[in-house]
Amino acid sequence: TAVLTQTDYLLVYPIGTEAGALPVKYWLTDTNAKNLSIHIQPTSSVRVRAMITGSGATTSPFGVALYCRKDADSYTKAVDSFGANVFRLYGAGATPDIPSSLTPTSNRLCSASCVVGAMLRDQSSSFTVQALTIGQSIELDTVIYIIASPGVTVNCRYQKDDGTALNVYTNTATMIIDEPAAGGMGF
């Protein structure tokens, strides 16, 4: 039986090239910053990068999307508007410092048997993960915008586009909303 596992994640600043944007914990290397939760301001943008690995048997191709939740709520697909959520996709607007949707991903988390993934910024840019053979991995990178009150926790993970969860989540991205920084500058 084919098994899909989200094995690792990396939370990255939204600004910068696909491969060159710094981890939010910028003083750490990608390897040391992976799978670490972060504390962010009540209004923040962040890139959620994750690696999905196939095992057991060759997987079938599937559409993929980022799903997030506030605190213990159910996971909801991140779309271009907030609706009732505290998160949304960044959007497709012209932002020269953030790669556009479907920009191919490099290998920041994957060290072997990697297939090319994609950057996702808006809901109109769908991406289909090709069939993964046993041991193959893919990296996906999605830019989200969060507006939430201090004390809120936002978790994000990749699921199939139709809402079906992957088989296993070894690590799930976690962002904890803090009080605004002194001086109101966000630093």
Regions found by a protein language model. Give the residues of each.
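Short, compositionally biased P/S/T/A/G/V-rich stretches that sit at domain boundaries
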Residues: 1-41, 122-123, 127, 176-187
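Generic structural hydrophobic/aromatic packing signal, biased to beta-strands
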Residues: 9-13, 48, 66, 140-142, ...
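Intrinsically disordered, low-complexity segments enriched in small/polar residues
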Residues: 14, 18, 61, 81, ...
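Extracellular adhesion/glycan-binding regions together with long Ser/Thr-
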Residues: 32-37, 90-139
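Low-complexity, serine/threonine/proline/glycine-rich extracellular segments that form mucin-like
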Residues: 36-93
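Ser/Thr/Pro-rich, low-complexity mucin-like regions
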Residues: 51-61, 126-181
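Enriched for extracellular/lumenal, surface-exposed ectodomains of secreted and cell-surface proteins
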Residues: 69-74, 82, 105-112, 157-169
